């Protein structure tokens, strides 16, 4: 069964690897597919896809979009050809992704707000208006027992409107954190999402991030990326 890690970042946002390094890590991890989902930009997406094609790796172009304050939650869009504008409402972000023919995935839900995670009431209001195409139910962020129970309960109660169940590593460090969490799927990836033929599970990858690289990434995420947003660079 094909294996995907469908939530990956590069130096184009707050990741720590080039497109070439990301593709190399995915190939060495024996993945069949990745999704390139940099924050609020698709600057590296085409290069990742081209390098993936050359290496026999399927690449879904996408973006992890930051919605408007005060929520400032993250929404994943897959199968995109052009960037999604940041700082729109959650509903407008979802609509913009769907207008492109993209798929909407909810990443790392119900985590603390500093993860930019959607919260239960917000997600309920969203799916009351429009179902989403998938939701990450297995991820590397430390959910804790209480949040895990909350997510499991929410998914059980609302599964018809939440789409496919997804697992991903939210990879920022290439070979150091890719394929920790993966999605098994049948046949064509997009079709598998639409038909909910996916299985999230723990993958073969192991976390091995050097401490210096970790702190450099935190600076990129918490300082450099917000400054670029303020300057209008992304």
PLM segments and residue spans:
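Short beta-strand/loop segments at the ligand-binding rim of alpha/beta enzyme cores
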Residues: 100-110, 161-164
């Amino acid at each position: 069964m094909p294996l995907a890690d469908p939530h990956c970042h590069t130096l184009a946002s707050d990741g720590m690897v080039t497109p070439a390094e990301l593709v190399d890590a995915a190939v060495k991890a024996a993945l069949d597919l990745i999704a390139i989902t940099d924050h609020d930009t698709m600057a590296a997406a085409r290069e990742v896809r081209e390098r993936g094609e050359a290496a026999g790796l399927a690449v879904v172009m996408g973006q992890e979009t930051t919605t408007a304050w005060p929520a400032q939650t993250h929404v994943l869009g897959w199968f995109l050809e052009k960037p999604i504008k940041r700082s729109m409402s959650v509903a407008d972000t979802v609509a913009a992704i769907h207008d492109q023919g993209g798929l909407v995935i909810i990443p790392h839900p119900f985590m603390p707000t500093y993860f930019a995670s959607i919260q239960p009431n917000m997600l309920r209001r969203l799916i009351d208006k429009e179902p989403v195409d998938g939701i990450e139910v297995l991820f590397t962020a430390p959910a804790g027992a209480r949040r895990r129970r909350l997510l499991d309960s929410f998914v059980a109660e609302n599964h018809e409107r939440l789409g496919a169940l997804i697992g991903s590593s939210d990879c920022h460090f290439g070979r150091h954190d890719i394929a920790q969490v993966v999605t098994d799927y049948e046949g064509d990836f997009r079709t598998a999402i639409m038909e909910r033929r996916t299985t999230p599970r723990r993958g073969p990858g192991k976390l091995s991030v050097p401490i210096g690289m970790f702190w450099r990434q935190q600076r990129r995420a918490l300082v450099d990326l917000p400054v670029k947003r303020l300057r209008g660079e992304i």
